[in-house]
C-alpha cells in the first residue's frame, strides 16, 4: 500500500509496485470484491467476508446489500490480514520479483513445485527458495510472470470473461455523491 499511496500523493509511479501490483494493488481499492457472491452455492464469498470482518472490517458488510469498507479502513484490514498470514507461518516478500520456478515430476504425470527463484528489486540479488506450496496473487497485469509460468509448463487457464477499468475522482466528488449536503461535515 505504501507505493500506491506514493503514486496518489506524490505522483511517483513504481512500475513494480502500484495500484495493480503488490499489497494495495490488484483491486485492493475497489469494493467489487465485496459484491462477488453471485452463484456461490458453497458460500465461499461469505467465508471471505468473515475474514475481512475478523481482520477489522465493519461487521455490516456481512448483511448489507451494497457492502462498503472504505479505503482508509481497507488498508488497515489488508495489513491485518498480512500479519495473520505471517503469524500462521506464511511468508510475504515485498520488493521481490519471481524470476524462476523449479518443478519436478510428481509421479502421476503432474508436476510439483520444488523451489522459487526471486530477485530482490533493491539490489538485484537472486535467491532460491525451497517450497512445495505457493500462492501467487498476481492480479491481471503480471504478464512477465504469466509468461514465466507458461514457459515452465505450468497449466494456466483464462477466466471466461473479465472487463474492468478504473475511474479516479477527487475525494470531494465521492463525498458529495455519498453524503450529499453533509459532505465535508467533520463527523462524516
What is the role of each PLM region?
Residues 1-29, 33, 37-51, 55-188:
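Residues forming the flavin
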Amino acid at each position: 500500500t505504501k507505493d500506491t499511496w506514493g503514486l496518489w500523493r506524490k505522483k511517483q509511479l513504481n512500475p513494480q509496485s502500484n495500484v495493480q501490483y503488490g499489497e494495495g494493488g490488484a483491486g485492493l481499492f475497489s469494493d467489487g470484491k465485496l459484491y462477488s457472491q453471485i452463484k456461490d452455492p458453497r458460500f465461499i464469498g461469505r467465508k471471505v467476508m468473515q475474514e475481512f470482518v475478523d481482520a477489522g472490517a465493519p461487521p455490516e458488510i456481512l448483511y448489507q446489500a451494497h457492502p462498503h469498507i472504505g479505503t482508509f479502513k481497507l488498508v488497515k484490514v489488508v495489513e491485518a490480514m498480512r500479519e495473520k498470514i505471517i503469524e500462521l507461518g506464511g511468508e510475504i516478500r515485498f520488493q521481490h520479483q519471481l524470476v524462476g520456478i523449479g518443478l519436478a515430476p510428481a509421479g502421476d504425470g503432474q508436476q510439483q513445485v520444488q523451489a522459487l527463484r526471486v530477485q530482490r528489486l533493491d539490489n538485484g540479488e537472486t535467491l532460491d527458495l525451497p517450497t512445495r506450496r505457493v500462492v501467487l496473487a498476481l492480479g491481471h497485469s503480471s504478464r512477465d510472470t504469466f509468461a514465466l509460468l507458461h514457459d515452465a509448463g505450468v497449466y494456466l487457464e483464462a477466466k471466461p470473461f473479465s472487463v474492468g477499468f478504473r475511474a479516479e475522482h477527487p475525494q470531494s466528488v465521492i463525498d458529495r455523491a455519498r453524503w450529499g449536503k453533509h459532505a465535508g461535515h467533520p463527523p462524516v
